[in-house]
Regions:
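Short, small-residue alpha-helix embedded
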Residues: 144-145, 206-229
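Acidic-glycine-rich active-site phosphate/pyrophosphate-binding loop
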Residues: 1-2, 8, 19, 183-198
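Phosphate-handling active-site elements
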Residues: 30-35, 196, 222-236
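Nucleotide and nucleotide-moiety/phosphate-recognizing core
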Residues: 88-96, 163, 171, 194, ...
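Charged C-terminal helix
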Residues: 3, 54, 230-266
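Conserved phosphate/ATP/ADP-binding segment of small-molecule kinases
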Residues: 119-195, 235
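Short pre-catalytic strand/loop immediately N-terminal to key active-site residues, enriched for Gly-Thr
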Residues: 9-15, 196-209
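Conserved N-terminal subdomain of the carbohydrate kinase-like
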Residues: 2-8, 28-111, 115, 262-265
Length: 266
């Protein structure tokens, strides 16, 4: 069987729980070979974001050229893009290199609430990037920002917003319902073929740093093995639930700790 080569385009996390570091751990845990393009150097830890150094857009583009000119990339995950010019650079290179099977994690805020995407970049993300990607994975605040609409408070409002996002041109939308006040944590998958609800009990842990990064990376790593996004999401969510269930066995940081990416091994 041909090995999967997976690319992550994202910012860093020195504490290892989110961003590029979480993506590469996820790829490895799920049997994919990980490549990376860095968009921002982020001084952050389990307590929050202290500082962000944005990489020059031309250098982001150069990194992408280096990878795509040499490595067969089977699947790509996009995370933190930080600002308008970086969004534009990534969108242009995806088009130039005819990149397919792209998962976009619409990263706007860190778990701590610190901003990771400038407000001016949201429109560029919406217009230039969304039509090129295969799947987006917004939580409810991110979906509201993309739609310039109020935050969904009910599952019915969540459904309406998911359908509106799908109409923007991407192949599929996985709306994450973790912000709903529900004992279950419902997610909804929207595709051209239909809609699918995923529900699982909330895992009782405070250590959820990097869950969005980890889920989107898992979706990217697993997609080439499955026939559709529904099958992919089922496996990715089950794997993430196990990583969350083992998060408390780690002892990382004083704040919101990471999930356990390698729970199957140690």
């Amino acid at each position: 069987m041909q090995r999967i080569n997976a690319l992550t385009i994202a910012g860093t996390d020195p504490s290892g729980g989110a961003g590029i570091q979480a993506d590469l751990k996820t790829f490895s845990a799920l049997g994919a070979y990980g490549c990376s393009v860095i968009t921002a150097l982020v001084a952050q830890n389990t307590c929050g974001v202290q500082s962000v150094y944005r990489i020059e857009p031309d250098f982001v583009a150069a990194q992408l050229d280096s990878v795509f000119s040499d490595v067969r990339i089977d699947t790509t995950k996009i995370g933190m893009l930080a600002e308008t010019d970086i969004v534009e650079a990534v969108a242009e290179r995806l088009q130039r290199h005819h990149v397919r099977n792209v998962v976009l994690d619409t990263v706007m805020l860190a778990k701590s609430g610190d901003p990771l995407l400038s407000p001016s970049a949201i429109e560029t993300l919406r217009v230039r990037l969304l039509p090129q990607v295969s799947l987006i994975t917004p939580n409810l605040p991110e979906a509201a920002a993309l739609l310039d609409a109020p935050h969904a408070r009910t599952e019915q409002e969540m459904l309406a917003q998911g359908r509106a996002l799908l109409a923007m041109g991407c192949e599929a939308v996985l709306m994450k319902g973790g912000h709903l006040e529900d004992a279950q944590s419902p997610d909804w998958l929207f595709t051209r073929e239909g809609e699918q609800r995923f529900s699982a009990p909330r895992v009782n842990t405070k250590n959820t740093h990097g869950t969005g990064c980890t889920l989107s990376a898992a979706l990217a790593a697993l997609r080439p093995r499955h026939r559709c996004w529904g099958e992919t999401a089922n496996e990715a969510k089950a794997w993430l639930s196990a990583a969350l269930a083992q998060a408390d066995t780690l002892e990382v940081g004083k704040g919101i700790g990471p999930v356990h990416h390698f729970h199957a091994w140690w």
